[in-house]
Amino acid sequence: MEKVIKKIVEYIKGYGDRMIIGISGHGASGKTTLANNIMKSLEKDNLNLINTDPYIIGSHLRKYTKIQYDYRGENHQYKMTACHPAAHNTYPLERDIAMWKEGLDLYTIGTPYTESKLIAAKKKILLVEGMTVAFTDPDLYDLKIYLYTDGTTELTRRSVRDVSERGTDINYLRKSHEERRIQYEIYMHPKRENFDIVIKNSNEGYMIERSCF
């Protein structure tokens, strides 16, 4: 992965203009880790970051929204997960990106777990990271990177992160994982076709499925 990060950073540094980078993928795919590694190699004084989690409709509301979908010849009904496009406030995110692109300062959305911060137009790079990126207009971005992993790796990572860091019940996590993964396969995975770089990232390693370099 270090070689991939190096190529991405070299491309960004050589771009020569203001740049918008979109990084997306399902939960526990490694997108935040990739974003952090890229930022470490760039000048912080010239870099903005928008994490798109605040643009996702909260699970406390989504749990009341049941959707039906067909998968491999079988009908399923389950609550709407963040892998469904309707779970995302895409228009506000697209507006905020467009504001920065037009030279306007803005503030990120404040939440109980993150403070609102300034996104300065004078900075040269805007990095937008999170699931919502996949459902926005791909033409907004100058470079788009998508990560995903297999279902087993995702569950393993979620078991560590969501249980230890977020207090999620392990039995609930395992029960909901299958339907979450099915919704991912139907609604989100096809969006990778809109990205310049596609990386399959698992505990066994990574594979570049597509690269613009």
Residue ranges and their predicted role:
Residues G27:
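The conserved Walker
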Residues L34:
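Hydrophobic positions on the alpha1 helix immediately C-terminal to the Walker A/P-loop
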Residues N48-N51, I57-T111:
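Conserved nucleotide-sensing/catalytic segment adjacent to the nucleotide-binding pocket
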Residues M1-Y15, T156, V160-S164, I182-F213:
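NTP-dependent small-molecule kinase module
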Residues I20-S24:
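Short hydrophobic/aromatic beta-strand immediately N-terminal to the Walker A/P-loop
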Residues K31:
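Conserved lysine of the Walker
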Residues K40-L49:
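Post-Walker A helix-loop "phosphate-sensing" segment adjacent to the P-loop in P-loop NTPases
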Residues S116-S164:
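ATP-dependent NMP and nucleoside kinases share a basic, alpha-helical "lid"
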